Structure formats: structure tokens, C-alpha cells
């Protein structure tokens, strides 16, 4: 336990939530103004830089407020800002797994690039609420639904193997057994309807496959939050610092995804590296009670698989150009 006091005053929470709401509103306005579109690397870089800048400004404001308060002082201010940045960087690092799974989910369901922005926008907003609940309620909720990790781990492994073996032909979503389980709970149509999550068929309101993708995005973030949130609690037990560092890091997930997605389109064999990563993550979840795989090893496997697939792609495409 830290010797420093918690700093989650109503004022601090108010400033934090106001900053988040303003940024979310700006994101929503941008989507409404530009409509469904493919996010390019310049736009992704701009949003990534903006989120990092806002996070740094918040940390700077927090330091000034704490250092100028006689109850806390400079020592507490320095410690809390250090905890914030440590938690922020840790969450950003662990988010690598999320990004690759997002790529896998979009690839598996063959979601058009111009609709991915909308899915991730709502997916990230949902993730904020879910992560806040997990942070404040604690590990009890995670233990109660621990079986979800095994279920989704099996799904990830199955999807990774299937993607590695699949061709580029259109896939019949209605024939997928795993999706059939979800469809028994939520009526899901077999065809996409632009960027709509719901549509009307035969006089009944049903979900589109895009809504199913949104559900998978939400579930994947919840699963990986089981790793990342306890990791941040190892840095600090102050719920305000855990919440703020986690949320600011997650808000940049969408922009990070499009940075990687734009690169992925340029490498012909990258999908095999991503499929391997997906399978590895699935196995990691399935074996978590018997084999503990450190995050450092997980990231090494991720970057190793991606590096190998990218290098192979570069060699292959260079040979094609030279012919």
C-alpha cells in the first residue's frame, strides 16, 4: 500500500469527467461532420497526438493543484503524477493485445474500413463505462464471471486458426456455429446495412452483423482489462489515479488501431502474423490457471510474429516488383 493519501476529491473527478466529455463530444462531432469514412494515417496521427497532449495537460494540472494544496504538497503531487504516467504507459503497452484482436475481429467479419471508425467509436465509449465499473467494484465481479475468459479464449483460438487457413472469398456468417449462439439471444441479420447497427426485416427490428462486431469489440476489451487493470493497481491503489490513467489510455485506442490498420493494408502476409497472435492470446487465456505468461513475453511474441510477417511481405513484394 502507498504511504501517500488518495486524491480523488469531487473537484478532481469533476475536472476529469468534464475533460473526457468534451473530448468525446468533439469525437462525436467529427464523426457526424465527416460521416462514415476510412480513417487515414494523418487523421490517426492527429488524434493520437491530441489524446497524448490532453493526458499530459491533465497531469500538469493535477500536479499544480496538488502541489499548491497544503494538505498534499509537492511530494504528494510528484508521486501522484508519477503514478499517473506509469499507469498510463503500462495501459498503453498492454493495449497492444487489444489492437491486434480488433484487427482480427474486423478481418474475420470482413468489415469495410469506412465503417470501422463508427464501431470503434462506440466500442471505446462502452469500454470506458465497463472499465470504470470494473475499477470501482474490483476483482469480485471478474471472479464471478471467470468462465468468460475460457469461452472467449476458445473463440479467439478458433478464429485465429480459421483465419490462417481461410481464403479471401466471402464467408457465410450464418453458418458460423459460435455466432449462432449469440443469434439465439440477439436476432442478427446475415447482411450488413451500411453503418447501421439495427435494421428492419419482415417487419421486425433485428441487429446487423456490425452490431455483432461491436459486441465482440466490447468483450475483447473487458477480457484484456482483466490483465491491465490489476497491473495498474500494482502501481497505485488510489482509485482516482487508476481510473484517470486507464481512461485516458483507452481513449487513444481507436487512433492507435488506425495507425496499425493503415500499415496492415500494405503487407500481404500480415494476416498470418495476426492470426498467430490471435491464436497465442487464445491459448494464453485457456492456460492461464496452469501457465503464467508474463506481459513481456506476450509482447515479444506479438512483435516477433508481426515482424516476421512484415519482413516476409517486404521480401515477397520486392520480388514481385523486380519481376
Label each residue range with its predicted role:
Residues 1-323:
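Multi-pass alpha-helical transmembrane bundle typical of ion/small-solute transporters
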